[in-house]
Amino acid sequence: MIKKIAVLTSGGDAPGMNAAIRGVVRSALAEGLEVFGIYDGYQGLYNNKIKQLNRYSVSDVINRGGTFLGSARFPEFKDPNVRAKCAEILRSHGIDALVVIGGDGSYMGAKLLTEEHGFPCVGLPGTIDNDVAGTDYTIGYQTALQTAVDAIDRLRDTSSSHQRISIVEIMGRHCSDLTISAGIAGGCEYIVASEIEFNREELIQQIERSIIRGKRHAIIAITELLTDVHSLAKEIEARVGHETRATVLGHIQRGGSPCAFDRILASRMGAYAVDLLLQGKGGYCVGIQNEQLVHHDIIDAINNMQRVFKADWLKVAKRLE
């Protein structure tokens, strides 16, 4: 029977992480468990930055963006000796289980602690990219989506005033859920997704045809890392004769107060993680599918499960362009 659990946030921050921490802490305390916060992710664990938390430690955090526990990239965790030391530190505090909030990289760390050291871990999907398998939505995605749509709305105001073409680069790496969803909600004329091969010439020809039909301005939503958007803007302007500007939303998408959906999702997932650990179920990750909370073997989720590309959403977006 577990008596003490710890929680950490790892990788890129996401709105709603604080709500998830709160869900873990207060649910665990309600079950008579002691809870410890690990500051600055796996790096903080390695440096023994561990502090006991109480219910007041998570007061007034549900509405705050970021993560009050802090986060950090820690590639050194790939070293088996580093992981062994981390497991030893956890046990030196009498900690019986760990909740990890983050993306795929964070899950991998939890997987290795479970596999190599038999340490019960539960992963919660915390990333704005929505690129974690086994869940329809990740914590932070809906808030980041609203941030992107708000930016697109503002860009449309100025683009329409100046008959300008605006390119908006949206986060997501190899997952275009944010781009596709923001493109639909923002009424973008063109959406460029990372899952589909990017054809610059085809895009420019589409814009040229739109201008011939009388289009006076346009918004192009594109997933990051596909191309240099500033170079693309110059090429479009030279070819079509319309002023073209690129805006990189960047890390602004990670900040801000989490929306109601993310606060509720994170709170539910945090409580669910504690329930799993109380049932003796370590080595799992939590997701939401068809509005129901679910859990998957974390090893299976990393090695075998594939995130579902929203091809039907992109098809709708293309029809609405």
Swiss-Prot record:
GO terms for biological process: canonical glycolysis; fructose 1,6-bisphosphate metabolic process; fructose 6-phosphate metabolic process. Allosterically activated by ADP and other diphosphonucleosides, and allosterically inhibited by phosphoenolpyruvate. The keyword ATP-binding applies. The active site is at residue 129. Coiled coil: none annotated. PROSITE patterns: PHOSPHOFRUCTOKINASE. It comes from the Bacteria. It is found in: Cytoplasm. One of its GO terms (cellular component) is 6-phosphofructokinase complex. The keyword Transferase applies. It is an enzyme of class 2 (transferase). It catalyses: beta-D-fructose 6-phosphate + ATP = beta-D-fructose 1,6-bisphosphate + ADP + H(+). One of its GO terms (molecular function) is monosaccharide binding. Homotetramer. NCBIfam families: PFKA_ATP (TIGR02482), PRK03202.1 (NF002872). Catalyzes the phosphorylation of D-fructose 6-phosphate to fructose 1,6-bisphosphate by ATP, the first committing step of glycolysis. PANTHER family: ATP-DEPENDENT 6-PHOSPHOFRUCTOKINASE (PTHR13697:SF4), PHOSPHOFRUCTOKINASE (PTHR13697). Belongs to the phosphofructokinase type A (PFKA) family. ATP-dependent PFK group I subfamily. Prokaryotic clade 'B1' sub-subfamily. HAMAP family: Phosphofructokinase_I_B1. This is ATP-dependent 6-phosphofructokinase. It comes from Haemophilus influenzae (strain 86-028NP). The gene is pfkA.
